[in-house]
Amino acid sequence: MKRKHLWVLNPCLLAMLAPTAWAEDQKAGAEEQMVVSASRSHRSTAEMAQTTWVIESQEIEQQVQGGKELKDMLAQLIPGMDVSGQGRTNYGMNMRGRSMMVMIDGVRLNSSRSDSRQLDSIDPFNIDHIEVISGATSLYGGGSTGGLINIVTKKGQQEQQVELQVGGKTGFGGHNDHDENVAAAVSGGNDNASGRLSVSYQRYGGWYDGKGNEVLIDNTQTGLQYSNRLDVMGTGTLNIDDHQQLQLTTQYYKSQSDGDHGLFLGENFAAVTGNAKAYNSGNLNSDRIPGTERHLINLQYSNTDFLGQDLVAQVYYRDETLTFYPFPTLAGKAPNYYVSSIGASQQKTDFYGGKLTLNSKPVDALTLTYGIDAEHESFNANQQFFNLAKAQQSGGMTLENAYSTGRYPSYTTSNLASFLQASYDINPIFTLSGGVRYQYTENKIDDFVGYNQQQAIATGAATSADAIPGGKTDYNNALFNAGLLAHLTERQQTWFNFSQGFEIPDPGKYYGNGTYALNGGHYQLLKSVNVGDSKLEGIKVNAYELGWRYTGDNLRTQIAAYYSLSDKSIAINKTDMTINVNADKRRIYGLEGAVDYFFEDSDWSAGTNFNVIRSETKVNGEWKKLVVDTASPSKVTAYVGWAPGDWNLRLQSQQTFDVSDDGDYTKANSTQGRKIDGYNTLDFLGSYTLPVGKISFSVENLLDKEYTTVWGQRAPILYSPTYGSPELYSYKGRGRTFGLNYSVLF
């Protein structure tokens, strides 16, 4: 056994032993590999010196038609991704313990503001496949220090097709415990042009936990209960000639609360102060409804013979409006807390840009990928406050507009980058790759009157206030990567990879904070966090990876050990949810992998994927466990599948493990360790192919386990006591839920 591991992972032994193994495996032949467009170099997974996963349409359909949400499906199938919080957003969901970038057809959905709505972006009905690159990457700029997800949409076919889907699920917890979905798409064309138009709609009802109690609506990141989702998407392809092609993707997406249901906070906000229990109510009357609304358009031109090179050019535009749930703010001191205001924020982003990528092969052994990227983003946010007296009397059910203020400083972000990536085949076994990306980023921050001071002026407690000065700042970053890939056989590769990632922390939560003194009705600015005095520093991550993959007829596996080190850390100020950037280094290391086995001459299959992870921060020269506010727990999933004839059955399990810390080192004299408890869920998914169409069925949380989600354990740490009782933010997982779905393609 030792020799086998040394042979796989030691480069010196690889050079001596791999030629023999290559010759022995020639007869087997290599399985066709899907090209990963997210690599920007038209390479397949077998040609990449980095952990890469491709979730194909059959896997997506099995999970989604079995009732899984996009976030839940990804957490089940991507080893390095954290478990889902089951809410609207992916806040707190990391890859390999760090932030991830999400794209649709190569257009990134991440903005400078870390709003975490990237996975509240598309109905899975419109997804063809999903590409995943684990670990830090600079292929598409900053923000992907933990990994990259590229959602590839369905495109039109030459032959005429109609696709229909209808389904629903329920836990039989009450009359409102039911979700429904319906979707339709039509596509067609000819040799020169094709297109697809789709409309999908999802309605969510109430959710109940394993004990039959209704799950509270998430009033922090907003929940999915009692909401609706509409996704309208059109794609078109025009083949100009044998080498040139145009592709167009347009989308309108809206996911929003139904406007009738909300969180009852008790008379005089008794549930906020801990004197009563909150519960969901259907009597909401609010002037602001939480949700996500997005428009996206993407035009791509490709030419496979541009001066002897492959050329891909993209121009794109995205705008989005993110609205949050009405949120109380406490004042006073324990035990005499009281609610001083209740409001809801709305944040708007406009984003446009372009990319140019060329792939060339100057000589047979050398492949070059190079190009330029340019992007511009503008951001603004406001906070709508509601009539406090009416909100108190109704327990937060009657929310009439009283006044509005700015929530964060408005700003723009511009990026201009060039990159060069090279891949050289040293011999039939070894491929050396490396590259560099240089990116220039400019931030322009507007002047901003402090958030609390704006409230005081709006309520008449003050007449004026100094503005915290804005300004302009820029960043210059050169990010490098290098890798060595060894083709042990046609079916087996091992690699070592080094890559750098970069992120600029959330400027909205960093700038615009100040200390004021009230003098005669005027707030005088004493000190502040501003561009001139305290520039927001970027965070660079160095990531290392040693991996191995094997793709056989029966056994398929990919395993990688990883280590990443960042030069700084982000800390959350729980009094106002702003951030600080500290000089504390952060290291994250672990083992990520997946194993699938298809039993020979059988309809059975089994598999597992896992991510064993540890996160640490260096404080005062000593490595400590990363606080559970942001630390990722280890995770393992497993499944058994049986697919005889027209049947396809799957039993799958997901286990997340405990994660703990040594106390909140951002607070003085804090030594009490904290823990997020792990839990296990079991799902049964199945389908049967009918003479016309397919029927899918599922039982999620098969054992009806009662548990608190990772986010439901993390939210009280972040929001309580500043924003109310911890019970207000303790979100349970959904109990046993039955699903039924019918789909047909003709």
What do the predicted segments below correspond to?
Residues 122-165, 745:
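A beta-strand signature from Gram-negative outer-membrane beta-barrel systems
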Residues 300-304, 308-328, 487, 493-499, ...:
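Membrane-embedded beta-barrel scaffold of Gram-negative outer-membrane proteins
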Residues 175-204, 213-260, 293-304, 361-366, ...:
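Transmembrane beta-barrel wall of Gram-negative outer-membrane proteins
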Residues 107-134, 184, 234:
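Short acidic/polar hinge/loop motifs at secondary-structure boundaries
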